[in-house]
Amino acid sequence: MKKALIVFGGWEGHEPKLCTEIFAPLLRERGYDVTLSDTLDIYLNQEFLQGLNLIVPLWTMGTITKEQEKGLLTAVAGGVGLAGWHGGMADAFRNNTEYQWMVGGQWVAHPGNIIDYEVNIIDHEDPITAGLSDFKMHSEQYYMHVDPSNQVLATTTFSGEHAHWVNGVVMPVVWKRMWDKGRVFYSSLGHVARDFDVPEAKEIQIRGMMWASR
């Protein structure tokens, strides 16, 4: 049986427990033995981590020790998949640049806060986005600093209404990448649990998890 770990905590505004309750059952339905952890100390147990197929980080605006960070980075570099979303993965540890390098991006702004915007699928061949069309979100439109080595699957375009100087900027929303031997998947969607009521947002996330899992 494949094994997945969901590590949830940090800022409660991103509803980590509610989001865990969405995706843990979806992983179990796909044959995963899912472990839930509400402590970053789980990253200190390298023997346990190396037995995993997938890690789902769901921890916003936290503080991670160098030892905990090294444990996570080492596990993913060794081949354990990493797949997450929104601030739970890309606004997790603002002082840890190597972690951000692994993720492939870091949140910096969401102009206008909760707004209507469109997500545009740009790769219709990749299994994560195949068969999906552009769709609308009513949530935070993440403005991010991103790694040019990411394989971008979906984007969004900023209107400039809430920050005129970024009018027309095309920003990655969904990407995948490698961290040594480990597959890394990220989606900036999912500010709160109800964002996954949008079928495409949920489908992209679960497909991304399946792709990342070794």
PLM-predicted stretches and their roles:
Residues L18, I22, G71, P127, ...:
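Extracytoplasmic/secreted proteins, especially bacterial periplasmic and envelope-associated proteins
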Residues F8-W11, G190:
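Residue-level signal for short, function-critical loop segments
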Residues Y99-Q106, F135-Q151, G190, A201-R214:
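Oxidoreductase and adenylate-handling cofactor-binding alpha/beta cores
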Residues G62-G131:
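A glycine-rich, often tryptophan-bearing local segment used as a flexible ligand/cofactor-contacting loop or short
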Residues K3-I6, E15-A90:
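Helical hinge/lid and interdomain linker segments adjacent to catalytic or ligand-binding clefts
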Residues G81-A83, L153, F185:
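Structural detector of well-ordered beta-strand residues that form the stable sheet scaffold
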Residues M1-K3, E29-R30, E47, H162-M171, ...:
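Extracellular ligand-binding/catalytic regions of CAZymes and related secreted enzymes
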Residues L27-R28, T35, Q50-G51, N113-K181:
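Catalytic beta-strand/loop cores that center a nucleophilic Ser/Cys/Thr
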